[in-house]
């Protein structure tokens, strides 16, 4: 293989390489053996067309494109490796020559990894607003949340208040005409839950069971039903029941109801204190890590970040976001309809974060390279075991999904992050 790389401008160049006849000939044979099964030529059974007849009738060149498609990925990868460049975006491929009996010459316009000039990344002084301290108020708030989860709704004779639940019938109309979706019977509505249009729940506060209330609201301008957006509506609402939460007493019995592993309220408080301490410690470490990495990135200089890198990260991020929506039962079309946005809008929303992530990744990779970090066979096996445990799959399945190069990369990145964070000092 002949390989050359000509730098055209910062982070861009043309990679030229050849595919030898030793590779081309057997691939043409494979393509022909596949193609001949699909074509009909009078006088020959399908699949039994001789090669000379094919060449005479169609020309050997008819096989070239399929053969090139099959050979190109490995040839390109080998050329990149031999040229000693790091490519960060999809190349623009061009065929220079494909002469019969000659090596094929291919050119690829490539975008290369930008130079990163590192600044300080060790012994950084950072500020974080996350506290590791667990207060009595933190513990009490956790118990109160669990206590409220065990609360029961009981009928209330007095007027409805914020936090109460009302059981209602309602009929909505605009200019005296009822509309689809504006009617409900025996609907349980938590006052203050924000389930209904802004202003609806507030107008039921202070009213008792048996009362009928004319609730007047205005639909938001961006309401999903365009025919109702921005319009004033009246909901004739009848309150059947008012219910309030009745929380259990704060005692040892409550503690046992919350957690069967404890016997007393004091034991529950101690358990929660330890759990909260672990959570706050983890949050504190994450905050220090984030602040230190941000400062290391700020101290570095990236020489002309290629827009293609950012575009690819935006594309990956948007696909991940829409995939998450899909798993929640919301298709891309449904999401864009509900939000009133477009694919282009979504890409723009992700651009800033995508650029920041791209810069961060480049700086951390540069630190790993500067430190000479590598991944040993033992570390790779440990990483495989850890991933298998985290995702509840066999180690061999992890090996199938992740190449050794990917695992090595992840391990060296973790080491670089550890260098940044372990030496950081909190002001």
Curated annotation (Swiss-Prot):
Which regions form coiled coils?
A: none
- What Enzyme Commission number does this protein have? 5.2.1.8
Pfam families per UniProt: FKBP_C (PF00254), Trigger_C (PF05698), Trigger_N (PF05697)
Query: Which keywords does the record carry?
Result: Cell cycle, Cell division, Chaperone, Cytoplasm, Isomerase, Rotamase
Q: Which reaction does it catalyse?
A: [protein]-peptidylproline (omega=180) = [protein]-peptidylproline (omega=0)
Q: Name one GO biological process term.
A: 'de novo' cotranslational protein folding
Q: Which GO terms describe its cellular component?
A: cytoplasm
Keyword field contains Cell cycle: yes
For molecular function, the Gene Ontology terms on record are: peptidyl-prolyl cis-trans isomerase activity; protein folding chaperone; ribosome binding
Which compartments is it annotated to reside in? Cytoplasm
Record has Cell division as a keyword: yes
| Similarity comment: family membership | Belongs to the FKBP-type PPIase family. Tig subfamily.
UniProt free text on domains: Consists of 3 domains; the N-terminus binds the ribosome, the middle domain has PPIase activity, while the C-terminus has intrinsic chaperone activity on its own.
* Name the UniProt record assigns to this protein: Trigger factor
Q: Which organism is it from?
A: Streptococcus gordonii (strain Challis / ATCC 35105 / BCRC 15272 / CH1 / DL1 / V288)
């Amino acid at each position: 293989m002949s390989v050359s790389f000509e730098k055209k401008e910062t982070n861009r160049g043309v990679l030229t390489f050849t595919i030898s006849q030793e590779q081309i000939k057997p691939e043409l044979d494979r393509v022909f053996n596949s193609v001949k099964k699909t074509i009909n030529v009078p006088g020959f059974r399908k699949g039994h067309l001789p090669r000379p007849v094919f060449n005479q009738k169609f020309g050997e060149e008819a096989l070239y494109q399929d053969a090139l498609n099959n050979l190109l990925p490995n040839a390109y990868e080998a050329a990149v490796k031999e040229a000693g460049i790091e490519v960060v975006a999809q190349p623009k491929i061009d065929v220079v020559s494909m002469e019969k009996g000659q090596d094929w010459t291919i050119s690829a316009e490539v975008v290369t990894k930008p130079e990163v000039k590192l600044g300080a990344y060790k012994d950084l002084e950072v500020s974080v607003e996350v506290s590791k301290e667990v207060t009595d108020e933190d513990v009490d708030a956790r118990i109160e949340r669990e206590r409220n989860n065990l609360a029961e709704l009981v009928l209330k004779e007095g007027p409805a208040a914020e936090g109460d639940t009302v059981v209602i019938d309602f009929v909505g109309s605009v200019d005296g005409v009822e509309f689809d979706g504006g009617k409900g019977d025996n609907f349980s509505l938590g006052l203050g839950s924000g389930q209904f249009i802004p202003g609806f729940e507030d107008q039921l506060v202070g009213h008792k069971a048996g009362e009928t209330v004319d609730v007047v609201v205005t639909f938001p301008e961006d309401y999903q039903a365009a025919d109702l957006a921005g319009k004033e509506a009246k909901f004739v609402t009848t309150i059947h029941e008012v219910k309030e939460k009745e929380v259990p007493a704060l005692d040892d019995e409550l503690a046992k109801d919350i957690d069967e592993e404890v016997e007393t309220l004091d034991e529950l408080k101690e358990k929660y204190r330890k759990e909260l301490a672990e959570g706050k410690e983890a949050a504190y470490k994450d905050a220090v890590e984030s602040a230190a990495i941000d400062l290391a990135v700020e101290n570095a200089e990236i020489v002309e970040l290629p827009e293609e890198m950012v575009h690819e990260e935006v594309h990956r991020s948007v696909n991940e976001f829409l995939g998450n929506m899909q798993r929640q039962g919301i298709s891309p079309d449904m999401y864009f309809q509900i939000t009133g946005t477009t694919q282009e809008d979504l890409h723009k929303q992700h651009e800033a974060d995508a650029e920041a992530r791209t810069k961060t990744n480049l700086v951390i990779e540069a630190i790993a390279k500067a430190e000479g970090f590598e991944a040993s066979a033992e570390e790779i096996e440990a990483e495989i075991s850890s991933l298998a445990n985290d995702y509840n799959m066999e180690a061999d399945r992890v090996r199938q999904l992740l190449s050794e190069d990917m695992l090595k990369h992840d391990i060296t990145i973790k080491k670089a992050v550890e260098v940044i964070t372990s030496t950081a000092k909190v002001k």
